[in-house]
Swiss-Prot record:
Its EC number is 5.2.1.8. It catalyses: [protein]-peptidylproline (omega=180) = [protein]-peptidylproline (omega=0). Residues 157-242 form the PPIase FKBP-type domain. This is Trigger factor. Consists of 3 domains; the N-terminus binds the ribosome, the middle domain has PPIase activity, while the C-terminus has intrinsic chaperone activity on its own. Belongs to the FKBP-type PPIase family. Tig subfamily. Pfam families: Trigger_C (PF05698), Trigger_N (PF05697).
């Protein structure tokens, strides 16, 4: 195989290589003969379709597929021959002839000696208690609460339906009429000064509040201003929580309505949530330590930019899903994500290097356990498992996640670490 490599930057390489034409023609010819034996075309007996007809009908597609496969195979072989470790996907361009190609790509930087025993990691521990289960049941009751109108003054936990309008200097918001809405006092949905001002109001009562809005407030006309906010309590309602009886328990999928089974199911769900939260904490902790230890290592620029653009796209999509309009995204908006992207790339490459240097292998048992854990959150777990097994993209994503967790655990076990005991609530708090 003809291939040459040159450095075009600290971490950029250019690989020039030539495809073996004989192998391509051999593959194309073999595939066309196979199609001639198996293809049914009207007017010809099975297996008797002339090669010329097969060539006219399938030749272009067969050649394109063969070229793509051989291109990938030849490039991979050249990469192995030159002991290159790619960081990201290559850009492959046509060379001077149909069989000459030029691949431009970035390589993994030299991290030197990766000694994880020098890292200091705090490993959080926590467990699910009966009190946590009690609190979850209380939260479920709150989800199913109904509201009963009352004549007394509003207090924390009450639902207040209200009308508001604001006066910011000479500007009235809205210009005419009022804005309507509702809020549960103590939920933190409304601005704190307004929410506290609603406490004690009775149905039909009006009040003017003096509110100091912060400079970064989401409504530009109010941001950084002292505003007179006029509020009227249209109705005040108190919550009515359902009893934890068989009907309530059955509504959450426990067909027997048994209280002990209900608590056992809740414990299982909370332990699954806790396991994920503790891994996320450990991933963040190990990542921060790796960043601190290897921040001096240069990262592949194009890979970092690609990651920054991906992070921007994710944020824009989140804005859309929330029902808001992200507006026109500037062409250079990804620049605001470059620092975070560089850190993410650094951790990802280091995790890969640790796995490679220490010959860590994906544990199929752990993949199966993680898949079962994911599937258990759905009503039809077996269907979810089957979906993953039949979708290479989903399964590859799962395997990558599990491999990363294996490496994170491996690093944490060998680093200098201290344990930090947390309550369930503290452990799951972001």
């Amino acid at each position: 195989m003809q291939a040459s490599i040159e450095s075009t930057g600290n971490l950029e390489r250019r690989l020039t290589f030539t495809l073996p034409q004989e192998r391509l023609e051999t593959h194309v010819g073999g595939r066309l003969r196979e199609l001639a034996r198996t293809t049914r075309i009207k007017g010809f007996r099975p297996g008797k379709v002339p090669t010329k007809v097969i060539e006219q009908r399938f030749g272009q597609q067969v050649r394109a597929e063969a070229m793509e496969g051989l291109l990938r195979e030849t490039f991979d072989s050249a990469v192995r021959e030159h002991s290159l470790r790619l960081a990201g996907n290559p850009r492959i361009d046509q060379g001077e002839t149909d069989f000459d190609f030029v691949a431009t790509f970035e390589v993994v930087p030299d991290f030197g000696d990766i000694d994880v025993t020098k890292l200091s990691v705090v490993r959080a521990t926590a467990e699910v208690t009966d009190a946590d289960i009690d609190q979850m049941i209380e939260n479920l009751r709150l989800q199913r609460r109904t509201w009963n109108p009352v004549e007394r003054g509003a207090q924390v936990g009450d639902l207040v339906a209200l009308e508001t309008w604001s006066q910011a200097g000479d500007e009235r918001l809205p210009a005419e009429g009022v804005e309507t809405g509702s809020s549960v006092l103590g939920s933190g949905v409304m601005f704190d000064q307004i929410e506290k001002g609603l406490e004690g109001l009775t149905k039909g009562e009006e009040k003017t509040l003096t509110v100091d809005f912060p400079a970064e407030w989401r409504v530009p006309q109010l941001a950084g201003k002292t505003v007179q906010v006029h509020v009227k309590a249209v109705e005040v309602s108190e919550p009515v929580l359902p009893a934890v009886d068989k009907d309530f328990i059955k509504s959450f999928g426990v067909k027997s309505g048994d209280a002990e089974q209900f608590r056992a199911d809740i414990r299982t769900n909370l332990e699954r949530e806790l396991k994920g939260a503790l891994m996320n904490r450990l991933r963040r902790e190990v990542g921060e330590q790796l960043i601190a230890a290897y921040a001096h290592v240069e990262m592949p620029p194009r890979l970092v930019e690609s990651e920054a653009r991906s992070m921007l796209a994710q944020q824009v999509e989140q804005v859309r899903r929330s029902g808001r309009d992200p507006g026109q995204v500037p062409a250079d908006a990804h620049q605001g994500f470059m620092d975070a992207a560089a850190k993410r790339v650094l951790v990802g490459l280091l995790v890969g290097e640790v796995a490679r240097r220490n010959e860590l292998r994906l544990e199929s048992k752990r993949v199966s356990e993680t898949l079962r854990l994911i599937a258990s959150t759905y009503e039809e777990p077996e269907q979810v498992i089957e979906m993953y097994r039949n979708d290479p993209q989903l399964m590859n994503g799962l395997q990558s996640r599990v491999m990363e967790e294996q490496v994170i655990d491996w690093i944490a076990e060998r680093a200098q670490h201290t344990e930090q005991s947390l309550s369930f609530q503290d452990a799951i708090r972001v």
